[in-house]
Each structure stands twice: as C-alpha cells, then as structure tokens.
C-alpha cells in the first residue's frame, strides 16, 4: 500500500496556476516497458485499480508510475479548480519527467480519456 512519504513531488504550471503533483514511481527490470497509470474522476493512486496495476507491474518486472491529479489524493490544489486540460497537463508532465522507458499508458474512466488526449 502507498505511504505518503513514498510520494515524490513535481510542480506543474507557473504562477498562480502552479500546483504540486504527487507521484509514485517504481523502477522495473531493464528492457521491459513500463506502465503509466491514470486514475478516473475523483479517484487517486491509492485506489484498488491503481494498486492492482502496481502489483501486476511488480510481478512482471515493469516500471510503474502513477500520480494524483491536482485536488486528488496527496496532490495539492482544490478539486474545484480542476479541468480535463489541467489534469492532462499534469499527466504529460509526469510522463515526461518520470517515464524513461517505452511506456504503456493505462487509464480508467476519465484517465482513459486523458490517455487518448
């Protein structure tokens, strides 16, 4: 299970639009593709689906990266300020900062929509 002290932080946006995004990253075996998990609306990276994806990644030697969108879980910001555009910007920033290997993007519900954007 996820612990708050395990989460890394990344700042996305500038000025008043800046927000701190919580990220969990677990490295995998060299040569294996990784997984980026994108949660659904009002879900976070500690949810059942996110934990199952992380467990699958561990047992198959894959890296796994997951985040809490702003206003969700361990990330900063108010939920009411969230938009699909902001949450997409956060997902892209996390992908660019953390996903070093070829990566499969997996999303649930709203996270699936964001994965397609």
Model-derived segments and spans:
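N-terminal cap/lid segment of alpha/beta-hydrolase-fold proteins
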Residues: 2-30
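Short beta-strand element of the alpha/beta-hydrolase
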Residues: 32-40
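The serine-hydrolase catalytic nucleophile loop
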Residues: 41-54
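Alpha/beta-hydrolase active-site loop
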Residues: 81-98
């Amino acid at each position: 299970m996820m612990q708050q002290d395990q989460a890394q932080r990344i700042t996305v946006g500038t000025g008043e639009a800046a927000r701190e995004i919580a990220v969990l990253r677990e490295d995998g075996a060299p040569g294996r593709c990784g997984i980026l998990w994108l949660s659904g609306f009002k879900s976070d990276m500690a949810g059942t689906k996110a934990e199952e994806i992380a467990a699958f990644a561990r047992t198959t030697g894959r890296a796994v990266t997951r985040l809490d969108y702003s206003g969700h879980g361990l990330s900063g910001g108010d939920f009411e300020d969230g938009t699909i555009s902001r949450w997409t910007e956060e997902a892209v920033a996390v992908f660019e900062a953390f996903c070093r290997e070829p990566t499969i993007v997996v999303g649930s519900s709203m996270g699936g929509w964001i994965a397609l954007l």
